[in-house]
Structures are given as structure tokens and as C-alpha cells.
UniProtKB/Swiss-Prot annotation:
Organism from which the protein derives: Shewanella sediminis (strain HAW-EB3)
Native organism taxonomy: Bacteria, Pseudomonadati, Pseudomonadota, Gammaproteobacteria, Alteromonadales
The keyword Transmembrane is annotated on this UniProt entry: yes
Cell membrane as UniProt keyword: yes
GO CC annotation terms, alphabetical: TAT protein transport complex
InterPro entries the UniProt entry points to: TatA/B/E (IPR003369), TatA/E (IPR006312)
Protein name: Sec-independent protein translocase protein TatA
Function: Part of the twin-arginine translocation (Tat) system that transports large folded proteins containing a characteristic twin-arginine motif in their signal peptide across membranes. TatA could form the protein-conducting channel of the Tat system.
Any one GO molecular-function label of the UniProt entry: protein transmembrane transporter activity
GO biological process: one example: protein transport by the Tat complex
Entry keywords, A to Z: Cell inner membrane, Cell membrane, Membrane, Protein transport, Translocation, Transmembrane, Transmembrane helix, Transport
Amino acid sequence: MGGISIWQLLIVALIVVLLFGTKKLRSLGGDLGGAVKGFKSAMSSEEEKKAIEDSASEKTAQTEEKKTESKDKDKEQV
């Protein structure tokens, strides 16, 4: 009632196969799979890039702290 039954889905799938053919659907599935794979690799490379930027900014902050500490020590010695 109000929902799509399994039989309706099967009939729609059968009509789609008859209209497009299995070769066309197979190539479409391959294209879709390639797009998903490309999207996943782009997302993972973006995460790696962000992690590298975070570690670089932490190293920069640590370097600046060390410079500040060494300047303070130099002032104390004078």
C-alpha cells in the first residue's frame, strides 16, 4: 500500500534491460564504477593533503616557539 513492491521493481528492471540491452547497461555500470573510484581517490588524496598541511603547520609553530625561546635566553644572558 503506497510503496513499491518487489514485483514492480522487477518489471521496471526488465523494461530497462529490454530498452538498453545488457551491453549498454554493463558499460554504464563500468563508467559509474570508475566515477566512484575516482571520487574516492580524490577524497583520500584530499585527506592526505590536509594531514600534510596540519603536520607542516605544527612543525612551523614548534620552530617559531624554539626561535622565541632562544631569543629570550639570549636576552637573559646579556
